[in-house]
Amino acid sequence: MILIIYAHPYPHHSHANKRMLEQARTLEGVEIRSLYQLYPDFNIDIAAEQEALSRADLIVWQHPMQWYSIPPLLKLWIDKVLSHGWAYGHGGKALHGKHLLWAVTTGGGESHFEIGAHPGFDVLSQPLQATAIYCGLNWLPPFAMHCTFICDDETLEGQARHYKQRLLEWQEAHHG
């Protein structure tokens, strides 16, 4: 099962993420948990989130890039849900062997995220990649949809179909 942890503080303003979710919903075996809908007060139901993660084979963290990072509710979700003794540490093996895909949308072009001489997403993904590895997750190459503020509908739709294709290819490779 593919579990999409969707974290957009203003989902009604997002044309790109909306299209990505619409494409993902057309696949079998996809569950979407919209954190800002579920937890507008930031009071996360840790047991419910861990139960959802337990059912997943592929976990997707989907969100808009905010100041070169993740939205605050996703950060809190990571801090609370990926707990010691469950996701890492002594006895914390609940996520071992599962896969993680970072799916991010940006308003700027890819070159906007270069940091000095370093390709931006290689640097920006390091904290998330380190978290994944620490929890025994298999890190997949990120999916990034750039220039979402200026893309026309056709371009956004094409990129959303590419996202669906990435998910479908993962499903086919892991479940035939």
From Swiss-Prot:
Keywords: Cell inner membrane, Cell membrane, Flavoprotein, FMN, Membrane, NAD, Oxidoreductase. Belongs to the NAD(P)H dehydrogenase (quinone) family. KefF subfamily. NCBIfam families: PRK00871.1 (NF002044). Regulatory subunit of a potassium efflux system that confers protection against electrophiles. Required for full activity of KefC. Shows redox enzymatic activity, but this enzymatic activity is not required for activation of KefC. Homodimer. Interacts with KefC. Its EC number is 1.6.5.2. It is found in: Cell inner membrane. This is Glutathione-regulated potassium-efflux system ancillary protein KefF. It catalyses: a quinone + NADH + H(+) = a quinol + NAD(+); a quinone + NADPH + H(+) = a quinol + NADP(+). It is a peripheral membrane protein. Its main location: membrane. GO terms for cellular component: plasma membrane. It is an enzyme of class 1 (oxidoreductase). Its cofactor is FMN.
